[in-house]
Every structure is written in structure tokens, then in C-alpha cells.
Amino acid sequence: MLASASLTQPHDSIASNDSGILYPISSTLSYSKLSTGHRAFAISLSVSKELDSYAKAILDPRWQEAMQAEIDALKANNNWTICPLHPGKVPIRCKWLYKVKLKVDDSVERYKARLVAKGFTQTERIDFYETFFPVVKFVTVRTLLALAAVSGWHLTQLDVNNAFLHSDLHEEVFMLPPPRFGNKGEVCRLLKSLYGLKQASRQWFAKLSSTIVNQGFVQSKSNYSAFTRIKGVSIIIILVYVDDILIASNDVDALNSFKQLLDSKFKLKDLGTLKYFLGLEVARTTKSISLCQRKYTLDLLVEIGLLVSKPASIPVKQFAKFSNSIGEPISYISQYRRLIGKLLYLTLTKPDICYLVHKLSQFMSSPKVPHLQAAYIIIKYLKKTPRQGLFLSAYSSL
């Protein structure tokens, strides 16, 4: 956690009191060259806390207030009606999720409690049918950002507040009420979707996409989460990833008009100029757009326990060879798979590790110790270059 606003290296605070650390993260990462606004934003990405249980939350008046606010919002949105359980029906369960959002100076911005359904307790063909929904491809995101850099388009980001709660629910789903908010023998008959339901994402995307298409946008046939509208010289392109919306346009008036329309349909949070989208940190100047995954890299270093390790100068040992027949098998295969998955995500902005990560991904079924050691070397290499990413020049030819 960030101790004070004067600390400009949030992840370095883990080792800040240990003068014996040989390789602190501050030796390879600095925020000093960032603009004041972007530096504050980069630090704010690391300052949030979570509460892990209802038993703790119910003892704190602040969390009680947050939970009551969530219940009131769900009732106002007509998400359910209270009724006796219908014969032959089995209610699903729910749980609370808690998060404290902090400001850059470590003061509390707000306490957020969210009620979610335990979707794993749903029964297929009774509580849900279809669950698939599309999300934008990352190659599309990079392509749009490259176009925006060259064309000088405006980039803005929207977040839909309680997105899933806006969509209608077609199935008959019953849910046990949350603790202390219901009477004995009563259940919640869900009228609208709820976070955690297996069909929640699908229902939300169906409602959002139909709203966008009705405004004259054309949905891409190769990427269903991309929408384009061209009127004369006015261009608006929309990319959707669940409740995160990225918009690029050369027409500010048309862009603002569309945002107002969306806000009238769904309650939006206008995040302003694009800075952070799906783990990608975006910094823009008049000459370029830079993409990196600094926070994701630092979080991975903390998780693996290599934050204070010696950085590697290259991502692989010289003359390294990988084989299924060399080395002892590792017992925690799932952890290896998870680690490689995280590294695959980092290849979005780090092409220098693409070959190695994809090579190591060939051993998912039976990884050996040398494969895990090679993955650790990649992570140590990433410590040396946490801010390195993609540079999209405004002067590139399309």
C-alpha cells in the first residue's frame, strides 16, 4: 500500500525500509520523466484495498452503509421481486465483494460493496441457456490506436456503471437473499441480470450492441465488439470490452452527442482521455502514443516474489534449449500454466519476449524444471524493462 503521496514508487514501498536490498525496483523504474498528471495516474493504479469476508464487513458501519446502498440501488433498478420459492425450484446463492478505492494521497475515495450471484450454483437449461458473448480483439485495439496516432483522432474512454444490472433476464431465476436483508421463507425472483450470473455478460452485450446499432453504427463482421459510423467526414469508431468502452473520433461534437445519448440509456462514467484500457497504460503526445503494461509487470514481480531479484539483461540464457525429455517434472502444473498465461498477456506490448513465451507454452501438459526456470528468467528480464512497450508514431505511414 502507498504510504504517502511523497512516495513516487508504489511497488518499491515493499522494500523501501530495507537498506540491504541490492536490486530495488527503483533501480530499473522511475516515474520522474512522466508528466505530473500521468505520474499521479500511474501511482493511483496501485492504491486500492479489498476486504475478504462478510463477517468482517458487517462489524464496520462504513461497510454496512455501502451494502445498504447497493441493496437500495438494486431495488430502485427493479432487479428483483421478493416472493415465496416456487415449487420444484432451487434458488442460487449470492455473496458480497468489497473494495476500498483510495486516492493518490492514500485517503479513502469510497467504500464499494457489490452483491454478486454465485453463478456456479446455476443449473444449465434451467437457470441459463446461452452464455457466449464477444469481446474486442487486442489486435483491433492496437490497430485503432495506431490509426488515432497518425490521424490525430480524439480518444476517450467510458465505463458503464453497474452495466450488467441494465439487461433483462429471460430465464426464471430465484436467488437466496443476502444475509440480514431478507425474511425467512422468501427468495429474490430476478427480473434483471446480476453480476455473477452465467448469462449476465451475454445479456448486457445484446442490449448495448442493439442500442449502438440503432444509432446508425455498423457492427464489424470480423469483430463483433467493433462498431463504425461514417457520416460525410465525421468518423466514430467504438470498441467494447464488457463494460469498458473505447471511442475514437475526428469529430468532437458528434462524439459528445453520442456520449450524451449513451448516458441517457445507461448511467456512464466518463473517464476522459484514454489512459488505461484492459491493463494497457496509454500515454499520448502530439508525436506519438505509447503503450506499456507497467502495473501488470510489477504486480507479476510481486506475485512471483522476484521484485527485489537481480534483473536479467536478456530474456533467455545463451544456448538454451527446451525439450520434453530434459529435467525433472514439476508437481504444480497449474501454477506453471497460470504463469505462462500471464506472460502471454504481456506479449501484447512486449514483442521481445513473444518467441520465448510461445516456446514455453508448448510444454503446458508436462512442464519440467528447466521450463519454469526459463520463465523466471523472462520475469527477471521484465524487471529491467517494466516501462518498455510499443511506440506508435504519429508520422507512420498506414
Predicted regions and their residues:
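Long, low-complexity, charge-biased intrinsically disordered regions
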Residues: 1-398
